Amino acid sequence: MTNKKAFKEACKFIAGGVNSPVRAFANVQSEPKFISHGKGAYIFDIDGNSYIDYVQSWGPLLFGHCDKDIQKACQKALHKGSSFGAPTLLETELAKLVLSDFPHLEKIRFVSSGTEATMSAIRLARGFTKKDKILKFEGCYHGHSDSLLVSAGSGAATFNSPSSLGVLEDVAKHTLVAKYNDINSVKELFEKNKDIACVIIEPIAGNMGLVPAKQDFLEELAKICKNNQTLLIFDEVMSGYRASYLGSYGINHIQADIITFGKVIGGGLPAAAFASRAEIMDILSPLGGVYQAGTLSGNPLAMAAGIASLTKAKKKTKLYDKLGKLAKKLTQGMKKLADEKGLPLQVCHVGSMFGYFFTKDPVSNYQDALKSDLALFSKFHKNMLENGIYLAPSQFETGFICSKMDDKIIDTTLEAVRESFKRI
């Protein structure tokens, strides 16, 4: 079966033919590639084509596809059982592994997705502060729970619908939206609203494209939250163990009240978490009145994969230096080639994360990102795919370097960029 036929058949039985909207390739005027398997830095579609994969399952695969250590850990766990709905030693082991490197985090709760993590973190913040409103930033995506699907990035931005039908006005009215990297917009909202339970932010935004928050902005944001008895939530579902081993904390050293984790923490399996100091976490049920639960939360396969992934990342002390150098080589190479061709391009990388925008102006917030030439991006994406390079099919997503990549792969990619730019 070909990709084209597979998508046509999928559309008969699956809403939109995909189980997450951006996978449909609708905004790049193409059909999705149906993947048969992956190995290292590569994925292979059912038509027999191979691609250098810079999506890496949208970030979780720090060590690429079919990493032997993670596979071995999963196989060992599966041999004992896939799920029990009861505590296992693996949960405590992964909890200790995560918390050991964050001095301000004392307890953690595992869930199955980033959406669950951010949704639960906000409920926890509201329960702890006894306040109702939350403040988020335009273009930041924190999953698809109702209160957070307001002025969102990621797939919502890709389909030009940063909010969603079905989100009730009575829910959305409690969500305040500030401008990313603009502290004055935050101050204005705090002046007008005295019941803000929490501020949630991607400290390294990856869902409007890659846009890091500025150090002074984050420092001032933390001060404002502290002065107003408002909890600061860092959504590190994407940037955790990607921007550095300690995520944004390893770069900006700002201690958020709550951190959400995901993607890499599950090693490619469904796992996420939220963590905070004990006085906050202890109001979660069964100790306190904030309810949160999940049938597959902390399931042994995901815990085993997470332990293998984080243990390997922690041991390989030079891993993040290598990934950062490759991301830098890729983005600087793209910028040089664009300049030679006279194409408008802004590039960025943080650790193993990278982004690029087809615009002549620097990008520091969502409105800047929206100035990108989407038609140009679509042509570029199609050309790159034809040249064997698999990039996220959206201008508003982040790319990822994995440990199985090297200089040769980056050189191959840059040659594809050169050829793609020639055809634009």
From Swiss-Prot:
One annotated Gene Ontology cellular component of this protein: cytoplasm
GO BP: any one term: protoporphyrinogen IX biosynthetic process
Cofactor(s) needed: pyridoxal 5'-phosphate
Keyword Metal-binding: no
Enzyme Commission no: 5.4.3.8
Isomerase recorded as keyword: yes
UniProt keywords, alphabetically: Cytoplasm, Isomerase, Porphyrin biosynthesis, Pyridoxal phosphate
Chain positions with N6-(pyridoxal phosphate)lysine modification: K263
Annotated PANTHER family: GLUTAMATE-1-SEMIALDEHYDE 2,1-AMINOMUTASE, GLUTAMATE-1-SEMIALDEHYDE 2,1-AMINOMUTASE 1, CHLOROPLASTIC-RELATED
Family statement: Belongs to the class-III pyridoxal-phosphate-dependent aminotransferase family. HemL subfamily.
UniProt protein name: Glutamate-1-semialdehyde 2,1-aminomutase
Organism: Campylobacter jejuni (strain RM1221)
Classification lineage: Bacteria, Pseudomonadati, Campylobacterota, Epsilonproteobacteria, Campylobacterales
